[in-house]
Amino acid sequence: MSTRGKHLFYRDRKEWNDITPVPQDDNGRHIVNIAYSEAFVDAHDYFRAVLIKNELTERTFSLTSEILLMNPANYTAWEYRRRIIKEISSDLNAELRFVARLIEEYSKNYQLWHHRQWIVEELSKQIANGSCNSLTHLSSDELRFTDDVISDDPKNYHAWQHRRWIVSFFKISVEEELAFTERMLLSDVHNNSAWNHRFYVVMLDEGLSPSVLTREIDFVQKRISFAPNNESSWNYFYGLLVPFVHNRKYIYSETSKPSDEKSSSNETDFMPKLQLMLKFVEDLMAVDRTVVDCLAPLSFVVEVYTDYLKLHFMKQSNGGGTLGKQDSPHVDASTGDSLNITYDPKTIFDRAISLCDRLANEVDRIRASYWQYRARQLMCFTKNFNLPCDIIIS
């Protein structure tokens, strides 16, 4: 009998005598033969045969287990296995354990995480009309599982994506996830995955009410003070700005759900926050002179200047006049000298162009073309509103 150690080939198993194996068809055009093991060839020949027959039985379920242990990335095998599971009503909890063992070894495999999500969805359907405690137990188990994987690999994209799905699917409490991200960022403030997860929790699950905005500004500023050149935290900081300039749907009042309506007061209401953000950069530069040459905060200031000008001209074009002096912040981030708040949009425009020039020629020369493009973009934008500009981009 053909065996290798304890392995019994399918061709030698009596219960498979009714199946004619289907060998792999390479059309005779292969340049280099892949050195498949004999067991691999044997199992896949039988797999192709039952797949053609669409046999959904216990033995084909066992066959897919062996196929997937040989190659966990075999999407066809996973899809076939799901059809078998539904047909034979296989134990989904056992299936969770099976895929968990594979994830322990292959944690960055797309097919494994997709299959796990499918299992959780099917399990939730089974217990939908049963005990709420069972559903809570399932969600807790999934959070704990992703926590374990992330603890081993804090930037595992697949685990973070699965956790994001779990939070949305089970409507996990915002407080629980904020605490989780805070713990992860305490461990590594540069963990962009943790910042990204927190952003989605705040924007999609909680909503950016005035009190939430204040809390998150305080949260991110403390992390920036600890690591001023951390691009992830500056991106998060800027992300808090984006809804007010580009997309209203994430903005909540304290008592209402988000709305797509554009409120003429949004821009003005946000200006004190914008001023505080820029004042924070000013103070940071005054305390730590190295920040003046850091790419991340300087890039942040360019974005804030740009968005300020957009808000200013949006209000002007809507017939609301110009933003008043009390609403119009300016920080001279191009020099790092003692900074004064000024109010003239033309001055802000000039400083933005000057900062783009400094980034292109001193701080971020490898992306000089990008910063030159940003300067030209600003000039084209302001020309549409008849803002005079006599700056030549170098």
Model-assigned labels for residue ranges:
Residues 1-73, 85, 91-92:
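Extreme N-terminal leader/anchor segments
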Residues 38-40, 52-57, 88-93, 134-140, ...:
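Helix-turn-helix repeat elements of alpha-solenoid scaffolds
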Residues 55-58, 72-75, 107-110, 154, ...:
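Residue signature of alpha-solenoid helical repeat architecture, marking inter-repeat boundaries
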Residues 97-228:
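Eukaryote-skewed repeat-based solenoidal scaffolds used as protein-protein interaction platforms
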Residues 96, 149-151, 251-252, 292:
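Eukaryotic gene-expression regulator signature that favors modular helical reader/repeat domains
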Residues 45, 54-126, 161-162, 166, ...:
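Non-catalytic amphipathic alpha-helical adaptor/oligomerization segments
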Residues 199, 203-394:
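Structured C-terminal portions of repeat-based eukaryotic scaffold domains
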Residues 48-51, 64-72, 85, 100-107, ...:
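A conserved position within tetratricopeptide repeats
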